[in-house]
């Protein structure tokens, strides 16, 4: 019997809350409705301050509650606007907002905020959340999890297929006999930060500002020396590495080595950041035997980024997931609806070959 699930996703970019109502029955999956709701600007600022260690334990606790309320508000609007009956929704899959992700420390952890109890109390609907904790407890990275969903969607395609998600971070999935996938590094996050700092825009529409600049190859080489790019998978990352602090440090060190770098304009740095995303993605795709690259995530709307990626990848075919009947914009929200379904039905998610965990496991905690 088919069931209805709502996936909730707010990513590294902090640019909105994506909701996806999906109908799922065994191997059948359909996106029925989807919508995006704005992310509270003050809450976004407080989250970024917390990531940059400008916070207190009290603030972190309050952010957890405020996020829960914001998710509940968005869900209530979604349900009301679409005249949905709450009793027919089997569960909500809530990723939460990642505050810090450190799976390789002595005491590995991944912290997602957004109190699931608030959602169940307000909506009267079962919520599945805390997806990453079990995988980390089993020695895994706890990320990325979308490769398992990509395999569910695209495993029947012929050829050597890869799936690329470009959000705040970028991650790839290699659909081979043994599933693999990992974060390649930054996607939109540094470009979004830089244009917001200089132009006040939340993102670089079509990559126009980056295109107006000239990439600095020497600066790009310095960026690409980041040890994360040299690390072999399994690996995952986030704002705790590729954020404001990282970029400021890189630019400061570059300025010290190149005393006369006043010629480097803000738009040139934006162009270099776009090239960083392109090169760090392309370098990984080129290592594989990929013939078809399916792209999803907000980065697909950056026209110049996609043009540069195609130039770098040459004969490899690049296609939007929309061409295969899967929403490129709501892929991650759909993934968490699917993960909620897997948890409700006590199915192991086959992700250990991606995360490096000791074994596959049932992921997520149920809040009722």
UniProtKB/Swiss-Prot annotation:
Binding locations of ATP: 11-18
Keyword Translocase annotated: no
Top-rank taxon: Bacteria
InterPro entries according to UniProt: Anhydro_N_Ac-Mur_kinase, ATPase_NBD
Recorded family membership: Belongs to the anhydro-N-acetylmuramic acid kinase family.
The protein's enzyme class: transferase
GO MF annotations, alphabetized: ATP binding; kinase activity; phosphotransferase activity, alcohol group as acceptor
Catalysed transformations (reactions): 1,6-anhydro-N-acetyl-beta-muramate + ATP + H2O = N-acetyl-D-muramate 6-phosphate + ADP + H(+)
Protein name as annotated: Anhydro-N-acetylmuramic acid kinase
Gene3D superfamilies per record: 3.30.420.40
């Amino acid at each position: 019997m088919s069931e209805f699930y709502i996936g909730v996703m707010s990513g590294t970019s902090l640019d909105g809350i994506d909701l996806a109502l999906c109908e799922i029955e065994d191997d059948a999956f359909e996106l029925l409705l989807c919508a995006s709701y704005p992310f509270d600007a003050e809450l976004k600022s407080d989250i970024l301050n917390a990531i940059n260690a400008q916070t207190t334990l009290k603030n972190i606790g309050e952010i957890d509650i405020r996020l829960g309320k914001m998710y509940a508000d968005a869900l209530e609007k979604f349900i009301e606007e679409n005249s949905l009956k709450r009793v027919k929704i089997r569960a909500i899959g809530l990723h939460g907002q990642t505050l810090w992700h450190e799976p390789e420390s002595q005491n590995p952890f991944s912290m997602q905020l957004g109190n699931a109890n608030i959602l169940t109390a307000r909506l009267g609907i079962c919520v599945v959340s805390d997806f990453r904790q079990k995988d980390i407890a089993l020695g895994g990275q706890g990320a990325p999890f979308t490769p398992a969903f990509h395999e569910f969607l695209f495993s029947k395609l012929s050829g050597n297929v890869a799936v690329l998600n470009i959000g705040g971070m970028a991650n790839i999935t290699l659909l081979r006999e043994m599933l693999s996938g990992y974060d390649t590094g930054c996607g939109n996050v540094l470009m979004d930060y830089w244009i917001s700092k200089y132009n006040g825009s939340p993102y670089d529409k079509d990559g126009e500002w980056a295109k107006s600049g000239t990439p600095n190859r020497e600066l790009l080489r310095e960026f690409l020396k980041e040890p994360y790019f040299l690390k072999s998978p399994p690996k995952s990352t986030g704002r705790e590495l590729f954020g404001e602090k990282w970029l400021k440090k890189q630019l400061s060190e570059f300025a010290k080595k190149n005393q006369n770098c006043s010629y480097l304009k803000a738009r040139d740095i934006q162009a270099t950041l776009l090239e960083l995303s392109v090169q760090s993605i392309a370098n990984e795709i080129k290592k594989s035997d990929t013939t078809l690259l399916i792209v999803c995530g907000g980065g697909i709307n950056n026209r110049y980024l996609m043009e540069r990626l195609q130039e770098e990848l040459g004969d490899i075919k690049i296609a939007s997931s929309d061409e295969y009947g899967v929403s490129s914009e709501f892929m991650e929200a759909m993934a968490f609806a699917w993960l909620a379904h897997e948890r409700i039905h006590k199915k192991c998610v086959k992700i250990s070959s991606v995360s490096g965990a000791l074994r596959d496991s049932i992921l997520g905690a149920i809040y009722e």
